[in-house]
Regions:
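Substrate-binding/catalytic cleft of secreted carbohydrate-active enzymes
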Residues: 332-577, 583-589
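Secreted/periplasmic carbohydrate-active enzymes, especially glycoside hydrolases
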Residues: 1-347, 351-355, 409, 424-425, ...
């Protein structure tokens, strides 16, 4: 049985699929050489630091983590065989049958290797992956990972942490899709990026709504390797995506070249929806979905699991958690300091959960007093401090190479996730962690994707750009003032309660501590109805409570770390969310 057996890339599916998750051999050594002996078995795709992996060892900077398995090629003959990795943290080299087939750097992004030339088609094949991960001794994106966990920073994880799989594809195949819906024009433009070395690419696309074909067309692009087609959505089949009605259109794309009868076919989906910031009936600037004001009310979600750290126990566990969030009356998750596997976003797409996506923070080791502790307390003094070059060193981006790495990571993030309708806002920087030239980051995002909002600097070191005036407030009275950007309370709350029987050993962390379920419920209700609700009429348009679940010794989640219990009273949470929605509807009319 393969862990996480579901097809890992719902937005670009093929029928050919061979899952390689399962027990592999592993070794941790001091060199990049093939290990003389193996240390044991590891359950892929769980990192060696996790309980689920069966290993429970931390990879140190400078060490090498080696993986080995054998595999048979996918069924079929001819074409190409592709080896896909959902994510490997952080840098890796991959060999098949003793031949280097490629590598990758960056622990949060998928990559694909063509292994056709190295395969033994009639027998078993040897796969060796060698990994290094500097964690917080490097400057690469790492999120909340640290080798010295505590408080708001958590244990490191390394190596393969998303699904590994094989596909057999035609000789000329689709490498990626760019799908761009246009809500106002009621169209969708599909561009297929192919492996074809030259000549005209014929692209065929069909759109279905509820199983009924509603649009289809051929495109012919004489440009090298790529084909493009734009399809019109009939008015009678125009179903906008929203949190209440998250309608997804099915999309099938096929290609051929020069009139040949050899097709590659992939299946995808898309939605028609539009994000904007517009004045409400009273002239106050609001977030708008499909031209209508929307209160975005949600939770900070860091995506950690007690047994698997970054990797969930199952797809069903992910789906269940997201469904529970929706059932409580929330419509937003801020994905904080992590990029999830593609299936997480797919479930948000179909459930109607809006996602604000952080770029994963990196940079040199943080001066926490400067970027977190003092800034949290002295926020009014530092909020508009410029993130110009004199500050880059203090904000952990002193090296030009680190800044260039961030730019590449930003591009990789947008390109990997822009296919998902659920994403409503990009967040390039959080609380100054590795921040530099936020205005440049906003421009880079808009060049890559101008269909979403941008929260330039979540928390502080606000440079006045982007679409969002983004406030983190755990300690001060809340006073919202309308301005030229829409106002979001992008972090608040964080009330801790270590629920008996579900608490982590050691110290607990949070922003104020409740004594019981009743006390936690009362505190949350007072904060949200007494402090937050009155600010809605003044322009507050998005709320992100800290946080969805407990994480390690940070025990300020609505749910316990093991997801077994909701900590405040669930009916009270639903009642508060209904009251916030009703008040927002009232003050925006």
């Amino acid at each position: 049985m393969h862990p996480l057996p579901e097809y890992p890339r719902p937005a670009m599916r093929r029928d050919s699929y061979e899952n390689l998750n399962g027990l592999w051999k592993y070794a941790i050594t001091q060199t990049a050489e093939y290990p003389a002996a193996w240390d044991g078995s590891i359950l892929v795709p769980y990192s060696p630091e996790t309980k689920a992996s069966g290993v429970g060892r931390t990879l140190q900077p400078g060490q090498w983590l080696h993986y080995h398995c054998t595999f048979a090629p996918p069924p079929g003959e001819g074409g190409r065989v592709l080896l896909h990795f959902g994510a490997v943290d952080d840098a890796c080299a991959v060999q098949v049958n003793g031949h280097l087939v490629g590598g990758h750097r960056g622990g949060y992004w998928p990559f694909t290797l063509d292994v056709t030339a190295q395969l033994n088609d009639t027998g078993r094949n040897s796969l060796w992956v060698a990994v290094q991960d500097p964690t917080d001794s490097g400057t690469q994106a790492r999120g909340k990972q640290t080798l010295k966990p505590g408080g708001m920073f958590y244990p490191a994880q390394s190596g393969i942490w998303q699904t590994v799989w094989l596909e057999r594809v035609p000789e000329n195949y689709i490498q990626s899709l760019t799908v761009t819906p246009d809500y106002d024009a009621r169209t969708v433009t599909v561009k297929a990026h192919t492996s074809m070395p030259g000549g005209a690419v014929n692209l065929w696309a069909v759109v279905r709504a509820g199983g009924v074909t509603i649009a289809e067309d051929w495109g012919n692009d004489e440009a090298d390797r790529d084909g493009e087609v734009t399809l019109n959505i009939p008015e009678e089949h125009f179903f906008p995506w929203s949190s209440d009605t998250p309608f997804l259109y099915d999309l099938t794309v096929g290609t051929t070249q020069g009139g040949e009868e050899q097709f590659d076919t992939v299946h995808s989906y898309f939605a028609l929806r539009k994000w904007s910031c517009e004045p409400d009936a009273r002239g106050v600037l609001r977030f708008c979905l499909n031209g209508k004001p929307i209160l975005l009310n949600g939770l900070l979600d860091q995506g950690y699991w007690p047994q698997g750290l970054y990797t969930p126990p199952s797809d069903a566990a992910v789906e269940r958690e997201l469904s529970e969030v929706k059932a409580l009356g929330f419509n937003l998750l801020r994905k904080h300091a992590k990029i999830e596997p593609q299936r997480w976003y797919y479930h948000c797409d179909r459930l109607g959960l809006v996602v604000w996506q952080d770029m994963v923070n990196g940079g040199s080791r943080y001066n926490l007093w400067f970027v977190t502790y003092l800034t949290n307390v002295l926020q009014p003094l530092v909020r508009r401090l410029p993130d110009a070059e004199p500050l880059w060193g203090l904000l952990s981006r002193g090296k030009a190479s680190s800044r260039e790495t961030y730019r590449k990571e930003l591009q990789a993030t947008v390109e990997a996730l822009r296919c998902h309708p659920c994403i409503g806002c990009w967040v390039p920087f959080n609380e100054g962690w590795g921040q530099f030239d936020a205005a440049g980051a906003v421009q880079a995002i808009r060049t890559l994707d101008d269909t979403r909002l941008v929260d330039e600097a979540s928390g502080w070191y606000d440079q006045g750009g982007g679409d969002v005036c983004s406030i983190h407030n755990y300690f001060y009275p809340l006073h919202v003032k309308p301005g030229s950007r829409t106002v979001a309370l992008s972090e608040y709350g964080g009330i801790a309660w270590p629920m008996p029987g579900h608490e982590a050993p050691g110290k607990t962390y949070g922003y104020g501590t409740a004594k019981s379920r009743a006390d936690l419920t009362a505190r949350c209700k007072k904060l949200q109805l007494g402090t937050v609700l009155p600010q809605l009429k003044k322009g507050l348009s998005a709320l992100v409570y800290t946080q969805l679940t407990d994480v390690e010794d940070e025990v300020n989640g609505l749910f316990t770390y093991d997801r077994a219990e909701i900590k405040p009273d669930a009916n009270a949470v639903r009642s508060v969310n209904a009251a916030l929605a009703a008040e927002f509807a009232k003050v925006t009319r």
